[in-house]
Amino acid sequence: MKPAIVILCLFVASLYAADSDVPNDILEEQLYNSVVVADYDSAVEKSKHLYEEKKSEVITNVVNKLIRNNKMNCMEYAYQLWLQGSKDIVRDCFPVEFRLIFAENAIKLMYKRDGLALTLSNDVQGDDGRPAYGKDKTSPRVSWKLIALWENNKVYFKILNTERNQYLVLGVGTNWNGDHMAFGVNSVDSFRAQWYLQPAKYDNDVLFYIYNREYSKALTLSRTVEPSGHRMAWGYNGRVIGSPEHYAWGIKAF
């Protein structure tokens, strides 16, 4: 082997050796910063290298920190890993909810405050569609799946009720408080049918605030109980961040 090639090989090897000697807390900071500034390609490459070097705990610690700090970028980071051939990293280093989301598995959306599962009414309300509300989690009509869409360096979701084959949207009109009622519709070419998720941690639970793209309002269940006994679903015109126990949703396998 020519001396120049030997020197080059030794140099490359030294770079990897130096990287392997970097303390985990520094590696965590570097990866965390890549995610927070939305440099997802860099975050994916760092994650792949860490995973190959058997340092998956670095990725797990970063994911936990992102969730604790309510960083929406955590969703984009996970989606890009999933999209770029690193589903194993999402399965091994993220909470199970992320795999359920990006694999488009059938799920239940469980409102933390009431322990009720989101579903759609049997009745159709005019041109708006089927009203969405909270129901006992054992109902067969509480099955949903999230369908990811990538646009402008951000991941959005269509939320499909698998029983009705209808999409979750917010109505155009509002109540006296400025809230938009949620419905299930067959199809809609509007940001009203797109949503984005913000992860949160409450006790030992991983939860998600679910925001509508059109109105930037979080999906919640009403505090008022209807005569039918249901709590209707609304896009809430108020602050929700910091109170996941009141306004966030759990994602469970159906």
UniProtKB/Swiss-Prot annotation:
Keywords: Lipoprotein, Secreted, Signal. GO terms for cellular component: extracellular region. It comes from the Eukaryota. Residues 1-17 form the signal peptide. It is found in: Secreted. Belongs to the 30 kDa lipoprotein family. This lipoprotein belongs to the group of structurally related '30 kDa proteins' that comprise major protein components of the fifth (and last) instar larvae and of pupae. This is Low molecular mass lipoprotein PBMHPC-19. It comes from Bombyx mori.
